[in-house]
Structure formats: C-alpha cells, structure tokens
Amino acid sequence: MRHNQMYCETPPTVTIHVKSGSNRSHQTRKPISLKRPILKDSWEASENNAQNNKSKRPRGPCLIIQRQEMTAFFKLFDDDLIQDFLWMDCCCKIADKYLLAMTFVYFKRAKFTINEHTRINFFIALYLANTVEEDEEEAKYEIFPWALGKNWRKLFPNFLKLRDQLWDRIDYRAIVSRRCCEEVMAIAPTHYIWQRERSVHHSGAVRNYNRDEVHLPRGPSATPVDCSLCGKKGRYVRLGLSSSSSSSSDTGELMEKDSQELHSAFSVDTAGDPPHTYSQVANDHQSNKENETNFVKKNKSVEWFAESEE
C-alpha cells in the first residue's frame, strides 16, 4: 500500500537570514590561526565539510499531497459540465495534462480545503494557468461561457477579479515547473486527465493568420471546431466523456444558477477586502451521479485514493 503523503518539489526560493547588529557586538572573535595543515588532512577535512554542508542544506519548498486532496480534485471531473468542456477542447489547447496539473498545484498553493474544490475555482485556476503559459490569448476565452453561463459578458470582469485574488492567495507563485507537473501526474499516471496530450502542431507560438476566422468564445451550445491537423472529427478519445450532450437543458440550468451565484457574490457591499471571495461561490449543482465513468472504473491507479485509511 502506498504512503498517504506524496512529495512534489517546486522551484526553490532563496531565503536570506540577516543577523541583528546587537548580536554581532557581543560575539567574541576567534583568533586567526596561520598554521598550514597537512595536505592530506586538509583534503579529507574539505570532503567531510562538503558532505556535512550538503546534508544540512535546506531543501526547497515542497508540496505535501494528501490522498483526500487528490481524490477531491479527481471528483471535479465527474461533473457533466467539466466533462463536456474537456470534450469540446478536443485538441487539448485549453486543458492539456500540464495545464490541468498546474490547476491542481494552484489548489495546493492556495491551500484550498476540500469544500473549495468547486467548479468555479477549477475554471479560475485553469484560466490563470492559461494566462501564464499560453501565448495564444483567444483560446482561453472559451472558459468564460462554460464557467459563467449565458450572462458571461456581464460577469467576466468579476471572473478576472477572482483570478487576481487567486493569484494573490498563492503569493504570486504562478510558475509551475515541468518537473513538478510530471511528479503530480506520476501519483496516478493512468488517470484519463493525464492522457490529454497536446499535438506538436498545436505547440509553440506560431500562428496561422490565413486560417478561417473562428469567433471565440463559442460556448457550450456549439460543437468542437473541426481541426484539419488533428482530423476532421477532432480527438474525442480518452477524454472521460459524459453520457449527456453539451447542449442538454440540465447543463444549461446548472450554468445559469452558477452565474447567478457569481453575480450575487459581487453584488454584496463589504467593508475592506473580503477574504477569498471566490471560495465563497459554492458549487452546489455538481453532478449527482454516484457511479464513476467506465474508464475510471477500469483505472486501477485510482484505487489508491479510494481505499480507506488503515
């Protein structure tokens, strides 16, 4: 059985410790010795000092990933709306495996509780990841109608404020290394969200300005755009699709309720800076399905998260 805690190293930061002047004044100076040690002894001493310094050297900041946190993150993808959003992104330009791993890292850096693993927080973190990593600005705008519903044009300025609040909550540490993403994915490597590979021809900052204009965002009511590079029908495999279509009335009602909650969260006048407003936008309308998708049932790597604590 695997350990309950997994470690994922993040880019190290530099900490400078400065002693106060009062402490320096009371320090006794050691006499300077000019004796030259024997060469062999000095070589062994230098090796021992190097090993001691290496062992005493503080390690960089790390993420301690709890089992229940990863489980709560995976449960987000049981939501029909999020599944349909992934189905729409058939070329993995908005939510490939690295952007999804960054989303989880943001949840950790923000110290989200289990109750804060909500749909709206997922879209906010994913939008921030796209802002940091992607050079093509237009693609990420597709997140607006999925997260905010039909009134997204009125609500997206507030959505951007929530993104900035999340950025502040993670202490503006929005850069996530490739190694950190891969270590997060290595916890459950066969989960279907880590199979979302982006094709090479969709990588980089090279743009084709002669392409047919596609007005973005298109929203949940539209079908994925045919991609001549990925194939006319797009890549719909291994995305964890839901049985409901993206144009279902239930999905539309859920999005409308979420947009109303987001609007009401900003309509309240508060004195001072409200702590973590975006965490107050509760997602009470996620899917009521208790059964996981067939793919997750066959995914044995997730059993580690489903097992009870011994």
UniProtKB/Swiss-Prot annotation:
Q: List residues, modification Phosphothreonine.
A: 223
**Which GO terms of the molecular function aspect are on file?**
protein kinase activator activity; protein kinase binding
- List of residues that carry Phosphoserine: 221
**Predominant place of localization:** nucleus
Q: Which UniProt keywords apply?
A: Cell cycle, Developmental protein, DNA damage, Nucleus, Phosphoprotein
User: Where expressed (tissues)?
Assistant: Expressed at a high level in testis. Also expressed in the adult ovary and in immature oocytes.
Kindly state one GO CC term assigned in the UniProt record. Answer: XY body
Its family remark reads: Belongs to the Speedy/Ringo family.
Kindly provide the name given to this protein in its UniProt entry. Answer: Speedy protein A
